[in-house]
Amino acid sequence: MQNFWCKNPQVAAEAVRCRWPKSAEHTIFIADEICRGRYLFQDHWEMEPTHTAVDFGAEIAGIDWAAVPFGDPEWLYAMNRHTSLVNLAKAWLYTGDDHY
C-alpha cells in the first residue's frame, strides 16, 4: 500500500519540508502538543478549528476518549477519528525523531 502513494516517503517528506516549510512546522507543532497530551484540532478535515487545547496530560491512560469539551459533540467525533496519528506519523517523517 505504501508504494501506491509514493515509492520513497522520505523523499516526499523532504519535498514538503522544502516547498511548504510552514505546513511542516505546523504539523510538528501539533505533534508536539499531542505528545504533551494537548489536543487542538486545526487541520481542515477534522472539524471547525479549535482555539483552546484540551490537556489530558502526557500519559495516554489519562485521555478521556468520551470527553465532550466545551459541550461540542463534534470534538468527540474528531478525537475518535484518531487524526492525531496522521500528524504524529508526518512529524516522524519530517524529523526522523522516534518520540513521535
Regions found by a protein language model. Name each.
Residues 1-100:
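Extracellular glycan-targeting catalytic surfaces
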